[in-house]
Regions:
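Glycine/Thr-rich phosphate-binding loops of Rossmann-like dinucleotide-binding domains
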Residues: 26-28, 90, 114, 167-168, ...
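Conserved core segment of the aminotransferase class I/II
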Residues: 211-213, 218-283
Length: 287
């Protein structure tokens, strides 16, 4: 796949890659992380090294609610499913929703890893035009009309509203509201992929789209960019009606996300100045 090829090249020591979305961990204090892991093993190793819940550790899910609150989301921990990175969350959503030949609407251009996932489930990907402010609402209306006129079924709209991959565009608040209104009217779920929302340089990004619509938006989050990508922990915040389906799909795939990495992150969030650490990443990337 394209994403596998990117990471294969990026892993070569002589290459400085700008292609793979790999975070720069030079701002992450390794001694601090070593202390977190050491303390976890000494005080709670039996739980950390055991199987866990297919939905994710309850304490971490509560802490994820606090993280999402920074972007205006009021969430119930029971509606969160912890995954092995948000890429797995996207795979689970695709597995639940997509039948061969179904249409998924995406931005033009869009994240290559998402496109590969949709095509793996034999979806037909329809690109919707963007401009310098992101996805164009009128183009979304036109795409929906065209797809349905051809008798095809749209399963969801996938977009990255904050610092979009690969363009870096941040979707303005008024467009978010308009896009949500269109999708509600047309009864189309929105899959909001938001790994970069807390990494704004000069000003906070607008509130997450999920903050405005809890019934029609499936929100994907990740600690890959705000802590470390190697921990491989993300999550999906879903409408209550979808939660059990997502948990069952995840359990059938991986049984449960790693308790060790979940509790490492939970300890980090509980005991370390994680907001200051995110600010350090922002300053590093700004330079």
């Amino acid at each position: 796949s394209e994403i596998r090829s990117l990471f294969a090249v990026a892993s070569r020591p002589e290459i400085v890659s700008l292609a793979g979305g790999m975070p720069n961990l030079s701002a992450l204090p390794m001694e601090m992380m070593a202390g977190v892991v050491n303390e976890l093993i000494l005080t709670n190793g039996a739980e950390a090294l055991q199987y866990g819940s297919g939905q994710g550790h309850p304490k971490l899910r509560e802490q994820i609610c606090d993280v999402m609150a920074l972007e205006g989301i009021r969430a119930n921990a029971d509606d969160i499913v912890v995954t092995t990175g948000s890429q797995q969350a996207l795979d689970l959503i695709s597995r639940i929703f997509i039948d061969p030949g179904d249409v998924v609407l995406v931005e033009a251009p869009s994240y290559v890893g998402a496109l590969g996932t949709f095509r793996q489930y034999e979806a037909s990907v329809v690109h919707v035009e963007m401009d310098n402010d992101g996805l164009i609402p009128d183009s979304l209306r036109a795409a929906i009309k065209s797809v349905r006129a051809a008798g095809r079924k749209i399963k969801f709209l996938y977009l990255i509203p904050n610092y979009q991959n690969p363009t870096g565009v941040c979707l303005p608040a008024d467009r978010r509201t308009e896009i949500l209104a269109i999708c509600r009217e047309e009864e189309i779920f929105v899959v909001e992929d938001n790994p970069y929302g807390l990494l704004g340089f000069d000003k906070p990004s607008p509130n997450a789209m999920r903050a405005e619509d809890s019934e029609n938006v499936i929100y994907l989050g990740s600690f890959s960019k705000t802590i470390a990508s190697g921990l491989r922990i993300g999550w999906a915040l879903v409408p209550q009606s979808l939660k059990d389906k997502l948990v069952i799909a995840s359990e059938s795939s991986i049984l449960c996300p790693s308790n060790f990495t979940q509790l490492t992150i939970s300890s980090y969030l509980a005991d370390q100045p994680w907001r200051d650490q995110i600010a350090s990443f922002c300053e590093l990337y700004k330079v």
